[in-house]
UniProtKB/Swiss-Prot annotation:
Keywords: Oxidoreductase, Pyridoxal phosphate. It catalyses: N(6)-[(R)-lipoyl]-L-lysyl-[glycine-cleavage complex H protein] + glycine + H(+) = N(6)-[(R)-S(8)-aminomethyldihydrolipoyl]-L-lysyl-[glycine-cleavage complex H protein] + CO2. Its cofactor is pyridoxal 5'-phosphate. Its EC number is 1.4.4.2. It is an enzyme of class 1 (oxidoreductase). One of its GO terms (cellular component) is glycine cleavage complex. InterPro entries: Aminotrans_V_dom, GcvP, GDC-P_C, GDC-P_N, GDC_P, PyrdxlP-dep_Trfase, PyrdxlP-dep_Trfase_major, PyrdxlP-dep_Trfase_small. The lineage of its organism: Bacteria, Bacillati, Actinomycetota, Actinomycetes, Micrococcales. It comes from Tropheryma whipplei (strain Twist) (Whipple's bacillus). This is Glycine dehydrogenase (decarboxylating). The glycine cleavage system is composed of four proteins: P, T, L and H. The keyword Electron transport does not apply. Belongs to the GcvP family. GO terms for molecular function: glycine binding; glycine dehydrogenase (decarboxylating) activity; pyridoxal phosphate binding.
């Protein structure tokens, strides 16, 4: 199957090898790889064709048993509209794009993200929201840390209401322990007579009861504390917004806005806050700026908060978020509009409250009728067993005397035989159950608005002979404030309008369906369409993460296989798939190291990090409770061994870990990597190998063989999961046996390696569900299953070949900053523009914008060295695209030379004025000393950027992060 995945043909591969002076791919790899590093054992994973792969996945899907889930707990059945499934989730224009660091070629997804931020701000009643987080539980931890940063209190106590979901509570405990925060349980009604920096409660508690938190928040604010609320977006269409309740921070999951449960994700969570907190907010933030033509344009704003700039001082370690799912979620809101969302929520609430009343009439003890969607029943929970075994219904068992039932968009429809099955469990007439839906249908939802007329109309609404409806109309938390009034949420409820809107936005963006994205350290390779197909199969997509394990046999077999494959391919003994991004894999690995030392009663908290490391490394170390000590790099870009020895010996009694990326972020295989690991081990530390660059290793080198103790792998880089415009990703953590017990899990015996006894993972959880974003694992499983071990090995070699071919072809155009053994690079290389900038005034930013005119996404800019571009072409690009890139860089060099020899004006030339838009070219006015054709570099199928060059400084000075008003 590698023939489909690998871009160049065998003849083209031979041509590139000949140009470099090698006879075979293995000859090239042997010349590039370090001496003295153990070769991996022969791992035999056979390759398969697409049909065999899909047939096998279909067999696994049939092994899953999809029952009617009424489990709730933050994961809900929902309906993914076909227009969203087809035009977003299955559309490579959306799922193959990268994080929008180059805003001129990202206006489509940036617009959808600012729509998402606006939606969150409107529904939460808060002024600022970011462009998605990861899972809900890790988002809860980020909300806690944000509260700690901005609180006036010096306390380390964080009050957590006892009504929060248990899985969120457990993640909070894991994250709080690492940074010295004390979680204090807050039973309902308990007085607060001690200092605390924050308080967190769930608006609808886990029991289903709606909590009026105004009094609690008022008391906490008087103590200088920050008030945090966990909330449900659908519920907020009916009930008072968190901002109006006094919350300072609100977070939650957008999963029920059309995103399947998929055994835990992927999904998008959200975080909103008061405007004063905008510079402390974690994650990405989209803002409005202006371009060179004074048009509104979107960009990522306030990036100085983030890990790639602030490193250990960043507000969070989050890099990849969940952009694709956030875009799908806001499209769901646009598809339904505010009235449609209210109708869905109203039906759920009507059915849930009505069913609770029926239960009470049948002598069941219901904890509260003051609910949105969840009913708690105080009765022996033998009902759970009977409901599951006899009627395929899943209820949440709290304890031996209590269960919970949650209604959602699907179950509230009361379709099919659901009323009959509920009737058999609870002894209620199925006709009465079915009538609950009829009561909903007779209700008018139009009174949910912020108008005075709505307030005055309460009495007439309440006087109707519909008791459930009356309860909602009279509810003290009933929402009066408006939301989603912007035309973008009201103009696209028709499918034609939404389809055209999404098409227009995707046309503004540059993704892999348009051309090469040679971003260094990002591995923008093929995401094969057939590998993505199974993600939305109902047998996978509709599986609740807390369903009985017997219902997930097929998915669990896939998980077991992929764990075994990843452990064997990387040279480790154990795997946790729980981390929902590479940043979370880093955190999980460092927490495992921390847990290991704590088990030995050793207080080790120093983390050595090379100066060249990615910013997430330092940010993750801080979140794991470690102190960062920077290790210098030498002139060749390698870790300075002398400085490493000095720092390791100086911190010998406190040394916990070294974080090192391999191949290095400078794009070379460091020859002394084994010695680097030995130095750290000598002084009692562990070696964390960042697996971001594993696309240069698979089949040839295993990080666990040269001294790594723990690593993470980026499945959205090396193993075929698409980047989605900024997520979702998966960052599994792999570890040696001595660290395996400290990986995140929930006390499940875990045995991915056939050579070792089973181990129990005792590390605290870091994500909402055991397997993180399990729904995307099918993609990586298919990638490995189809390519096999030899196919993946060939992918590695071709990736290295293409990088070296381009580097050598361009070495006379721009210097290659670092090379390794035999003057070779790994899978990426750094082009140095610093001298050119000095003599011409043309910066790497100018070059990146000019590349847009030529139809390329820019390489990684000014990382890890300012004034450089890091190029990673991957193995998937056709040889014709490789040649086009080489030709383009040479053309740009020729343009720079015209600036140097003063043929071009130094401030008014095709590079300084790039990118060139269609609007500019079509304008009657052309005030530039070069021709229109020179500016646009016209080719067949040309990509036109949606905006001219965007003013970054303006965007950071004028923070505006919601939908701007439409022009007249």
């Amino acid at each position: 199957m590698h023939e489909r995945h690998i871009g160049p043909s065998q003849e083209e591969i031979d041509h590139m090898l000949g140009f470099l002076g090698y006879k075979s791919l293995d000859d090239l790899m042997n010349a590039a790889l370090p001496n003295g590093v153990q070769s991996p054992p022969d791992i035999k994973i056979p390759s398969h064709d697409e049909l065999t792969c899909l047939t096998q996945l279909a067999a696994y899907a049939k092994m899953n048993r999809i029952k009617t889930s009424m489990l709730g707990q933050g994961f809900y059945n929902c309906i993914t509209p076909a227009v969203i499934r087809r035009n977003i989730l299955e559309n490579p224009s959306w799922y193959t794009s990268y994080t929008p660091y180059q805003p001129e070629i990202s206006q489509g997804r940036l617009e959808m993200l600012i729509n998402f931020q606006t939606m969150i701000c409107d529904l939460t009643g808060l002024e600022i929201a970011n462009a998605s987080m990861l899972d809900e539980a890790s988002c809860a931890a980020e909300a806690m840390l944000l509260a700690k940063r901005v609180s006036r209190s010096s306390s380390n106590k964080y009050l957590v209401h006892n009504g929060v979901f248990p899985h969120i509570r457990r993640v909070l405990e894991t994250r709080a322990d690492a940074v010295g925060v004390e979680i204090v349980d807050l039973p309902e009604g308990q007085s607060i007579d001690f200092d605390h920096f924050g308080v967190y409660a769930q608006y609808q508690s886990a029991s289903g009861k709606l909590l009026d938190l105004r009094h609690l928040f008022s008391r906490s604010k008087r103590a200088g504390a920050i008030c945090v609320i966990g909330c449900d977006l659908l519920m907020l269409t009916l009930f008072t917004s968190p901002g109006e309740l006094g919350a300072d921070i609100a977070f939650g999951s957008a999963q029920r806005f059309g995103i399947p449960m998929n055994f835990g994700g992927p999904l998008a969570s959200f975080l909103a806050a008061r405007k004063a907190m905008e510079r402390s907010l974690p994650g990405r933030l989209v803002g409005v700026s202006v371009d060179a033509d004074s048009n509104h344009a979107y960009r990522l704003t306030l990036q100085t908060r983030e890990q790639h700039i602030r490193r250990e001082k960043a507000t969070s370690n989050i890099c990849t978020a969940t952009v694709l799912m956030a875009i799908a979620a806001v499209a769901f809101a646009q598809h339904h509009g505010p009235k449609g969302l209210r109708a869905i929520a109203h039906r759920i609430n009507t059915v849930a409250v009505g069913f609770a009343r029926l239960l009470k009439q049948t002598a069941f003890r219901v904890s509260s009728l003051d609910i949105f969607d969840t009913i708690e029943i105080n009765n022996p929970t033998q009902l759970c067993v009977e409901a599951e075994s006899k009627h395929d219904l899943l209820f949440w068992k709290v304890d031996d005397n209590k269960l919970r039932i949650t209604f959602d968009e699907v179950t509230a429809r009361l379709d099919g035989d659901l009323p009959e099955r509920l009737s058999k469990v609870f002894g209620i007439s199925p006709d009465k159950i079915r009538d609950l839906g009829c009561n909903y249908d007779s209700c008018d939802c139009s009174f949910y608005s912020d108008s005075q007329q709505a307030r005055e109309g309460l009495s007439s609404v309440a006087s109707r002979n519909i008791s459930v409806h009356s309860d909602l109309a009279r509810h003290p938390l009933r929402r009066f404030s408006g939301y989603l009034k912007h035309p973008v949420f009201n103009n696209y409820t028709g499918e034609v309008a939404l389809m055209r809107y999404l098409k227009a936005l995707s046309d503004k963006d540059f993704a892999l369906d348009r051309g090469m994205i040679p971003l260094g350290s990002c591995t923008m390779k093929l995401n094969a369409a057939f590998q993505l197909e199974p993600v939305l199969w109902p047998e996978f997509a509709n599986l609740h993460p807390f369903a009985p394990r017997g219902d997930a046999d097929g998915t669990l077999q896939i998980i077991d296989q992929i764990e075994t494959w990843l452990a064997n391919l990387s040279g480790y003994d154990a795997v946790s798939l729980q981390p929902t991004a590479g940043s979370q894999g880093e955190l999980a690995g460092l927490l495992a190291i921390r847990g290991y030392y704590k088990s030995l009663n050793l207080d080790r908290d120093v983390c050595l990090i090379p100066a060249s490391a990615h910013g997430t490394n330092a940010a993750s170390a801080v979140l794991a409770g470690m102190r960062v000590v920077v290790v210098a790099c030498d002139q060749q870009g390698n870790i300075d061994l002398d400085d490493l020895r000095l720092k390791a010996s100086k911190n010998a009694h406190a040394l916990a870990a070294l974080m090192v990326t391999y191949p290095s972020t400078h794009g070379v295989y460091e020859d002394n990597i084994s010695e680097v690991c030995s130095v750290v081990h000598k002084y009692g530390g562990q070696v964390y190998v960042d697996g971001a660059n594993s696309n240069a290793l698979i089949g040839y080198l295993r990080t666990g063989d040269f001294g790594g103790d723990v690593s993470h792998l980026n499945l959205h880089k090396t193993f075929g999961i698409p980047h989605g415009g900024g997520g979702p990703g998966i960052g599994p953590v792999v570890a040696k046996a001595h660290l395996a017990p400290f990986l995140p899990f929930r006390n499940r015996v875990h045995k991915p390696s056939t050579d070792l006894p089973a181990v129990k993972h005792m590390g605290g959880p870091i994500a909402s569900s055991d397997y993180g974003f399990a729904g995307a694992l099918y993609i990586s499983w298919a990638y490995i299953f189809c390519l096999g071990s030899q196919g993946m090995k060939r992918c590695t070699a071709v990736a290295v070949l293409v990088a070296n071919y381009i580097a050598k072809q361009l070495s006379d155009t721009f210097p290659v900053l670092y090379t390794g053994k035999n003057n070779l690079v790994a899978h990426e290389f750094i082009m140095d523009f610093r001298e050119v900038t000095r003599v011409s005034g043309i910066t790497v930013d100018d070059v990146c914008k000019r590349l847009i005119d030529y139809g390329f996404h820019a390489p990684t800019m000014s990382f890890p060295v300012p004034g450089t571009l890091m190029v990673e072409p991957t193995e998937s690009e056709p040889f014709s695209e490789i040649q086009r890139f080489i030709k383009t860089i040479r053309s740009i060099r020729a343009e720079i030379d015209r600036v140097i020899d003063k043929t071009y004006d130094p401030d008014n030339n095709p590079l300084k004025r790039a990118p060139h838009t269609l609007e500019q070219i079509a304008s009657d006015k052309w005030d530039r000393p070069y021709s229109r054709r020179t500016g646009i570099v016209y080719t067949s199928g040309k990509y036109w950027p949606a905006s001219a060059r965007i003013d970054n400084a303006y965007g950071d000075r004028n923070i505006f992060c919601t939908c701007p008003d439409l022009p007249d």
